[in-house]
A protein has these predicted regions:
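Basic/aromatic-rich interaction segments and small domains that mediate binding to polyanionic partners
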Residues: 13, 29-55, 79-91
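Short boundary/loop segments of OB/S1/cold-shock single-stranded nucleic-acid-binding domains
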Residues: 2-20
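Short nucleic-acid-contacting surface segments enriched for D/E, G, S/T with interspersed K/R
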Residues: 67-81
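Structural detector for short beta-strands of small beta-barrel domains
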Residues: 6, 21-33
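Beta-strand/loop nucleic-acid-binding surfaces
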Residues: 53-69
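Amphipathic hydrophobic-ligand
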Residues: 20-25, 63, 79
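OB-fold/S1-family single-stranded nucleic acid-binding modules
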Residues: 91-111
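A structural detector for beta-sheet-dominated domains
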Residues: 9-11, 43-45, 61-63, 84, ...
Length: 111
């Protein structure tokens, strides 16, 4: 699948930009930009931090029931999303932790 460039604006947690060099936007790519996928894993161009945890990918899903992230591909400017990042439990297993909300849009050319 081709890679689709995305720009994710993190609206909450409110101090996200403070922890990430003044930036509240994440840039990255996904190979899952298709209606076939309800959630998209986005590989970030640079790592991000929430609390004391650093991560280099996030999983995004639609914020509202009945909507899909793929509506972004149908000409909508942006869509509201839930944002999860990977964490490890006490047994060392990785899971997706819901910790942020925001919006996603197709990244402008050159970003």
């Amino acid at each position: 699948m081709p890679r689709t460039r995305l720009k994710i604006h993190v609206a909450e947690p409110f101090d996200f930009s403070r922890l990430n060099g003044g930036e509240s936007d994440l840039l990255g790519w996904t190979a899952q930009a298709s209606p076939a996928f309800s959630d998209w894993v986005v590989h970030l161009d640079r790592p991000a931090v929430v609390g004391e945890e650093e991560f280099d990918k996030v999983k995004i899903s639609s914020r509202y029931a009945g909507e899909t992230v793929s509506k972004l591909l149908e000409g909508f400017g942006f869509t509201a999303i839930n944002i999860c990042y990977p964490r490890r439990d006490e047994d060392g297993r990785t899971y997706w932790h819901f910790g942020m909300v925001g919006n996603v849009l197709l990244a402008p050319e050159g970003q």
